[in-house]
């Protein structure tokens, strides 16, 4: 099984935000990693950056270890230009996420850049 075989694939860029909440709540680290391109970057709460799937895997493994519960936010309008999309979600606590997704050769979408929480 490859990462691409893990969970449902994003047919629309907006699907990625829904999938991340579902997989966080399920503790599905491999399913989370499968939402990213191999060389993607993920901003970390401490100001660092996880680069590539191995570092993203470690970051999510640490995050879900305590089994926190995540609540979906309000998906903001997606901006698409060719094979790139800018997605954003307003979180229940007032913060905002910002992500860049890229359309893959099979028509599905994966994140390239993920800023999970900007201050409110």
Residue spans of the language-model regions?
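A beta-strand edge to alpha-helix "cap/lid" segment located at domain peripheries
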Residues: 1-29, 41-120
């Amino acid at each position: 099984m490859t990462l691409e075989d893990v969970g449902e694939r994003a047919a629309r860029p907006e699907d990625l935000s829904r999938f991340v909440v579902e997989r966080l709540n399920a503790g599905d680290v491999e399913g989370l990693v499968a939402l990213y391109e191999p060389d993607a970057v993920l901003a970390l709460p401490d100001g660092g950056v996880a680069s590539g799937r191995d570092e993203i895997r470690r970051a999510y493994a640490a995050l879900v270890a305590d089994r926190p519960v995540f609540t979906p936010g309000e998906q903001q309008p997606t901006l698409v230009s060719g094979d790139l999309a800018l997605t954003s979600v307003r979180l229940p606590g007032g913060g905002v996420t910002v992500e860049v997704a890229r359309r893959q050769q099979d028509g599905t979408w994966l994140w390239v850049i993920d800023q999970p929480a900007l201050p409110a």
